[in-house]
Curated annotation (Swiss-Prot):
Belongs to the class I-like SAM-binding methyltransferase superfamily. CmoB family. It comes from the Bacteria. Signal peptide: none annotated. This is tRNA U34 carboxymethyltransferase. Its EC number is 2.5.1.-.
Length: 323
C-alpha cells in the first residue's frame, strides 16, 4: 500500500490544509483501486540501494549524487531497477552516475518558461499534470519554499518517489506528489504560482479547466500555462478528429490569441504570450529509457510540418497571467 502520511502532514501544516477534506477520500480510493503494476513498481523502490548523496544539482539535468559516491555494483543495480520503471518521459536525470535520457528534453521547456516567472523565492507552487516531477525540482532550484505536484499517473508517482528517495531529506521535505487530478480540488486560492504544462488540450472543457486553475491561485498570484496551439486569430479554435499526432485524447487547440481571450473572459490580468515554439524531434524522441514511438513517428514522413493525420505539427505556446 502506498503511504502518504508524510505528504499529508506537510499539507496540514501548509496554507492549503483545506485541501485535505477532498484529498483524503481520493487517496483512499487510489489505495483501494491500485494499478495492476503498482506492487511491482513499489518493489522496485524497496530494492533501491541505500545511497547518500553529498552533491545535488537541480539544473538542466537534475543530478543526485555523483558517480564516485556509489560503487559499480550499486550503480549497476540502480540502473536495472530504474529501467523497470520505463517509460521515462520527462527529465533528464543523473542519479549517482546513472543518466536517464528521457523522451522529452524537459529542460528545454524550462529554459523557455523560466525567464517569464515571477520570483519563486519563498513561494508555494502547484504543478498540475506534473508527470514524474522533473519541473518540481527545477521550481525548488528557483527558490520555491514548497512545491506540490498532482498527476493521476501511477507510474509517474513511482518515478517521482524513486528520485525523491535518493534525494537528501532537506529536498524531500519540500516536494510533494499526489496521484490525483484537479477535478475535486477546492477553491483554495492559496498558491502563489500555478503551472499547467501540456494538459489543456486533454481537457474536454478547457474553459472550465482554466477556471479551476484560477480558483487555486491567491490574489496577485501567477498562472503559467503551456499548451499546444494552432496558428490563427482570436476566433481560431480547432477540434481534431479521433486522433491528433496519434493521441486520442486531444480536444481543443486554440490559437494563442484565442486562448488569451478565454483567460481575459475569466478575469485573468496581465495576460502575455511569452513563447511560441514548434516542437522538434530533438526535444521529443525515442531513447533507451523510452523505447516506444515518439514524435518522429507521429509526423508526416514527407512533410514534418504536419502530423501523420494531416494537421499542423505541434506548436506550443507559453502564456502567463495573474489573478
Amino acid at each position: 500500500m502506498v503511504d502518504f502520511s508524510k505528504e499529508l502532514r506537510a499539507l496540514v501544516q501548509s496554507p492549503h490544509s483545506q485541501w485535505l477534506d477532498t484529498l483524503a477520500p481520493q487517496l483512499t480510493a487510489f489505495k483501494n483501486n491500485p494499478h495492476g503494476n503498482l506492487k511491482r513498481w513499489q518493489r522496485v523502490l524497496t530494492q533501491l540501494p541505500n545511497l547518500t548523496a553529498k552533491h545535488v544539482k537541480l539544473s538542466n539535468t537534475v543530478q543526485v549524487g555523483e558517480a564516485d559516491e556509489a560503487s559499480d555494483a550499486d550503480r549497476a543495480r540502480l540502473t536495472g531497477l530504474l529501467q523497470q520503471l520505463q517509460p521515462w518521459r520527462k527529465g533528464p536525470f543523473d542519479l549517482f552516475g546513472v543518466f536517464i535520457d528521457t523522451e522529452w528534453r524537459s529542460d528545454w521547456k524550462w529554459q523557455r518558461v523560466a525567464p517569464h516567472l515571477d520570483d519563486l523565492s519563498g513561494r508555494q507552487v502547484l504543478d498540475v499534470g506534473c508527470g514524474s516531477g522533473y519541473h518540481l525540482w527545477r521550481m525548488l532550484e528557483a527558490g520555491a519554499e514548497q512545491v506540490w505536484g498532482i498527476d493521476p499517473g501511477e507510474l509517474f508517482l513511482m518515478q517521482f518517489r524513486a528520485i525523491s528517495q535518493l534525494m537528501p531529506l532537506s529536498w524531500q521535505q519540500r516536494a510533494h506528489f499526489f496521484p490525483v487530478g484537479i477535478e475535486h480540488m477546492p477553491e483554495l486560492k492559496s498558491f502563489d504560482t500555478v503551472f499547467s504544462m501540456g494538459v489543456l488540450y486533454h481537457r474536454r472543457s478547457p474553459v472550465e479547466f482554466l477556471q479551476q486553475l484560477k480558483s487555486l491561485i491567491r490574489p496577485g498570484g501567477q498562472l503559467v500555462l503551456e499548451t499546444i496551439v494552432v496558428e490563427g486569430d482570436e476566433t481560431t479554435v480547432m477540434m481534431p478528429g479521433e486522433r491528433y499526432a496519434q493521441m486520442r485524447n486531444v480536444w481543443f487547440l486554440p490559437s494563442a490569441s484565442a486562448l488569451s481571450v478565454w483567460l481575459e473572459r475569466l478575469g485573468f490580468k496581465d495576460i502575455s504570450v511569452v513563447d511560441h515554439n514548434t516542437t522538434s524531434i530533438d526535444e521529443q524522441r525515442r531513447t533507451d529509457w523510452m523505447t516506444g514511438e515518439s514524435l518522429a513517428d507521429f509526423l508526416d514522413p514527407n512533410d514534418t510540418n504536419k502530423t501523420i493525420e494531416g494537421y499542423q505539427a505541434p506548436i506550443r505556446a507559453v502564456i502567463t497571467a495573474r489573478v
